[in-house]
Amino acid sequence: MLDPNMLRNELDAVAEKLARRGFKLDVEMLRQQEERRKVLQVETESLQAERNSRSKLIGAAKARGEDIEPLRLEVNELGEKLDAAKAELDKLQNEIRDLALSIPNLPDDSVPVGKDENDNLEVSRWGEPRQYDFEVRDHVSLGEMAGGLDFAAAVKLTGARFVVMKGQIARMHRALAQFMLDLHTEKHGYLETYVPYLVNHATLYGTGQLPKFGGDLFHTKPLEEESDSSNYALIPTAEVPVTNLVRDEILEEESLPLKMTAHTPCFRSEAGSYGRDTRGLIRMHQFDKVEMVQITRPEDSMAALEELTGHAEKVLQLLELPYRKMLLCTGDMGFGSSKTYDLEVWLPAQNTYREISSCSNMWDFQARRMQARCRNKTDRKTRLVHTLNGSGLAVGRTLVAVLENYQQADGRIQVPEVLRPYMGGLEFIG
C-alpha cells in the first residue's frame, strides 16, 4: 500500500512512476475523492463542535430554570446531521482505502522500464550448461523411469497439476529441502520457522494477496462470503505467514535485520495459466518451497536484497546448476515489489533457462498494510520497516533441474555431492 500522503500531495509523480509498470492511475477520481473527503471532514468537525456547544447551553439553561426543549430538539437535529455526515465520510474513506489497496508498488529508479519478460535485463550467468553425447530426456521421463514420479496416481487422487513422488525421487525432494534449510540457518543466519499453511484474510491483506489476487488462492469458504475467524485460504507462499509475524509489531531497530526461513507446501490455483507447462513439475497447484524473509531498516533494504539474492544463488552454486540472474523490468514485476531479481536455472530438455527463484524488495508497501514498524533507540520515534522475500529455492523446480542436469546415458541420476549426506551416501538413483 502506498503512502496516502504521496497520493494526496505527489499524485502526478506517483502516476508517472506507476505508468512505467503499465498501471494507469485514475488521477482525476483520486483528486475528486480527496476534495470530497476534505469537505466532509470539515463538515463533520463543524457539526461536532456545534453540537457540543449547544449541549453545554442545555445545562446552563436548565440551571436557570428555562425551557430546554427547543435546545434539546436542536441538539438532536445536529446529532442526526452529524451521524449522516460521519456515515458518508466513513463510506468515502472505505472507497479511498479500497482503491489504495488496488494500486501496485512504485518501481525503484534502478529498475529498467519495460513491458514484459522480454525487456528483463540479464545481470550475470554462473556455470556452463553441460554438453551431452546422448539424447537428453526430460524430468518426467527420468522420474517415471526411476518409478518416482506418478502423475496418473495424482490425477486419480485429486486432478491435474498434482504429483505423487515415491522412493528415491521422494527422498531427493526431501533432501533438497533439508539441504536448503541447513544452508540458510547454519551459514546465512536465518531463523527457521514452522508456520500455518492456512491463514486468515487479514494476513493475506498484509502481504498484498487480497483484495486483488483472491482468485489465485484456494479458500475454505467462497471469497465473497463475509470474512470471519473461520474463513481461511491456503498459503501461496511462506512469504505470507512469515512476513506477517511482524504485523502490528514495533521492533527495536537494533534487533534488525530479522532473517527468517520456512519450508512449506504452497498452493496456487494457477488461474490464467491454462495450457502452460501442462507436462511435469514446473507449474503445480501444490509444490514445496523454502522461503527467505528479511525485515530491515529502510536504509538497509537495497543491500539486503543483494544479500538475500546471493543466498538463493548459493544454493544453485553448491548444487552446481548453471543459472542466470535477471533484473525484472517494470512491466514484469510482482504487484508489491519495488525491485526484483529472478534466478533462472538451465533445463537441458527445454534448452532454456527457467525461473527457480524470485527475490524482491517490497520497500514499505507490505509494512504499511501490516503496520509493522521499528523504533529508534535514541529518539524513540517509529517508522515503517522494509520487507524482503525470496525463494531459496522452489524445491520441485530444483528437483527438475537436478534430474535433467545430472542425468546419465542409461537414465540414472547422479546425486549432487552436497546432497549425498542427506541420501545415505547414494551416488546414483534410478
Swiss-Prot record:
L-serine binds at T237, A238, E239, E291, S391. PROSITE patterns: AA_TRNA_LIGASE_II. It catalyses: tRNA(Ser) + L-serine + ATP = L-seryl-tRNA(Ser) + AMP + diphosphate + H(+); tRNA(Sec) + L-serine + ATP = L-seryl-tRNA(Sec) + AMP + diphosphate + H(+). It comes from the Bacteria. Pathway: Aminoacyl-tRNA biosynthesis; selenocysteinyl-tRNA(Sec) biosynthesis; L-seryl-tRNA(Sec) from L-serine and tRNA(Sec): step 1/1. The keyword Ligase applies. Keywords: Aminoacyl-tRNA synthetase, ATP-binding, Cytoplasm, Ligase, Nucleotide-binding, Protein biosynthesis. ATP binds at R268, S269, E270, E355, I356, S357, S358. Its EC number is 6.1.1.11. GO terms for cellular component: cytoplasm. The keyword Ligase applies. It is found in: Cytoplasm. Transmembrane segments: none annotated. Belongs to the class-II aminoacyl-tRNA synthetase family. Type-1 seryl-tRNA synthetase subfamily. Consists of two distinct domains, a catalytic core and a N-terminal extension that is involved in tRNA binding. Catalyzes the attachment of serine to tRNA(Ser). Is also able to aminoacylate tRNA(Sec) with serine, to form the misacylated tRNA L-seryl-tRNA(Sec), which will be further converted into selenocysteinyl-tRNA(Sec). PANTHER family: SERINE--TRNA LIGASE (PTHR43697:SF1), SERYL-TRNA SYNTHETASE (PTHR43697). This is Serine--tRNA ligase. It comes from Yersinia enterocolitica serotype O:8 / biotype 1B (strain NCTC 13174 / 8081). The gene is serS.
